Regions:
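A generic local structural motif
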Residues: 20, 70-71
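N-terminal helix-turn-helix DNA-binding core of bacterial DNA-binding proteins
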Residues: 10-59, 79, 83-91
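Alpha-helical residues within the helix-turn-helix
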Residues: 52, 69-70
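Residues within the DNA-recognition helix of helix-turn-helix
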Residues: 64
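Amphipathic alpha-helical dimerization/coiled-coil segments
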Residues: 1-19, 40-41, 89-114
């Protein structure tokens, strides 16, 4: 619902909410969120390239990429001996970038009273 639209929007169906929770839970790790942001901003990359750029060991990064791939947030494609990762679609990058931008607007370490 928007401020100038008095008609309430319908609630999301429970299955969609459950899938959204799973998607957000998978993203909710600093390495995975950074990987998704990097792939959105810079495009496809190999595990080695990502590890070097992000300062993450290849074994740890492979574990995180497997989780992202299992949830269909990234796609892996073989290119000779290398495996190249890319976002499954741009919606993933938009969600990540919006979350990062929103957090930045709120200020580091700021916690809302609730």
């Amino acid at each position: 619902m928007h401020a100038n639209d008095p008609t309430p929007a319908p609630l999301a169906d429970p299955l969609s909410v459950e899938h959204a929770v799973d998607l957000l839970a998978t993203m909710a790790h600093p390495v995975r969120l950074t990987v998704l942001s990097w792939l959105y901003r810079r495009g496809p990359a190999s595990v080695g390239d990502l590890g070097e750029a992000l300062g993450v060991e290849q074994s740890a990064l492979s574990h995180h990429l497997r989780q992202l791939r299992d949830r269909r947030l990234v796609v892996a494609e073989r290119d000779g001996k290398r495996v190249i990762y890319r976002l499954d679609d741009d919606h993933v990058g938009c969600i990540v970038e919006d979350a990062i931008r929103h957090a930045g607007e709120r200020g580091a370490g700021e916690v809302a009273d609730g």
